[in-house]
């Protein structure tokens, strides 16, 4: 079985001038992991941060928090070792960004990280299937990657459902426009890792939002297990 339902705030939506404090606020509010978006200005139009920031956060936050790296970069092979050294726990690269996923998966594992494989909305989920048994997590984008605050794309849910049906033990993450109004659709489709940005980061009570998201996700997972 996939691991239990986990909620990962997207720190790109935080006050970046106080990034360490914002991460601590999320962890203190019950976040299961931190989702860190790395953008290079090539694979996506925007630019965020790289491994020096990850290294600084690891030093400030200690070894316990789980860093889920979403690598929206055109050369994901280039950043595996730097991210591993910086303290990343999971390295999710885009299928669209490499011609040799197998070698990249091997490199990530050899550098001591878990492997995530992401697909954009326009990429058919079947292209991910040959690699599903070699990875720890599949990331289904529910917005076009590159910018925060976009509208959730409900028509991505069949991808999640297909993955859950075909690969019951796979962690499936959704990212983009996910919050209290949309999480039930993700959970019912089979997602068990929920990335949420502004819905958590901009809430006056992030703990209550995290708990709500987790409860909806857990209830859907329990229902799926009963329906088998």
Curated annotation (Swiss-Prot):
Its EC number is 5.1.3.1. GO terms for biological process: carbohydrate metabolic process; pentose-phosphate shunt. Binds 1 divalent metal cation per subunit. Active with Fe(2+), and probably also with Mn(2+), Zn(2+) and Co(2+). The active site is at residues 37, 175. The modification N-acetylalanine is found at residue 2. A divalent metal cation binds at residues 35, 37, 70, 175. GO terms for molecular function: D-ribulose-phosphate 3-epimerase activity; metal ion binding. Substrate binds at residues 10, 70, 146-149, 175-177, 197-198. InterPro entries: Aldolase_TIM (IPR013785), Ribul_P_3_epim (IPR026019), Ribul_P_3_epim-like (IPR000056), RibuloseP-bd_barrel (IPR011060). Its cofactor is Fe(2+); Mn(2+); Zn(2+); Co(2+). Keywords: Acetylation, Carbohydrate metabolism, Cobalt, Iron, Isomerase, Manganese, Metal-binding, Zinc. The keyword Cell membrane does not apply. PROSITE patterns: RIBUL_P_3_EPIMER_1, RIBUL_P_3_EPIMER_2. It catalyses: D-ribulose 5-phosphate = D-xylulose 5-phosphate. Homodimer. Belongs to the ribulose-phosphate 3-epimerase family. Catalyzes the reversible epimerization of D-ribulose 5-phosphate to D-xylulose 5-phosphate. This is Ribulose-phosphate 3-epimerase.
């Amino acid at each position: 079985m996939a691991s239990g339902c986990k909620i990962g705030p997207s720190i790109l939506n935080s006050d970046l001038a106080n990034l360490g404090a914002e991460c601590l606020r999320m962890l203190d509010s019950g976040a299961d992991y931190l989702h860190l978006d790395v953008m290079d200005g090539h694979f996506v139009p925007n630019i965020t941060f790289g491994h020096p920031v990850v290294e600084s956060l690891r030093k400030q936050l200690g070894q316990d928090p789980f860093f889920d790296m979403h690598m929206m970069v055109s050369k994901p092979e280039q950043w595996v070792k730097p991210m591993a050294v910086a303290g990343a726990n999971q390295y999710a690269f885009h299928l669209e960004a490499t011609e040799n996923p197998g070698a990249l998966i091997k490199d990530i594992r050899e550098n001591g990280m878990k492997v995530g494989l992401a697909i954009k909305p326009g990429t058919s989920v079947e292209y991910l299937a040959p690699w599903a048994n070699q990875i720890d997590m599949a990331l289904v984008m529910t917005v076009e990657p590159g910018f925060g605050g976009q509208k959730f794309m409900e028509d991505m849910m069949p991808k999640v459902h297909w993955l859950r049906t075909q690969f019951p033990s796979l962690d499936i993450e959704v990212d983009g426009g996910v919050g209290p109004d949309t999480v039930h659709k993700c959970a019912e489709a089979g997602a068990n890792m929920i990335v949420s940005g502004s819905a958590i980061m901009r809430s006056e009570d992030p703990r209550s939002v995290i708990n709500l998201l987790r409860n909806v996700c857990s209830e859907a997972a329990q229902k799926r297990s009963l329906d088998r």
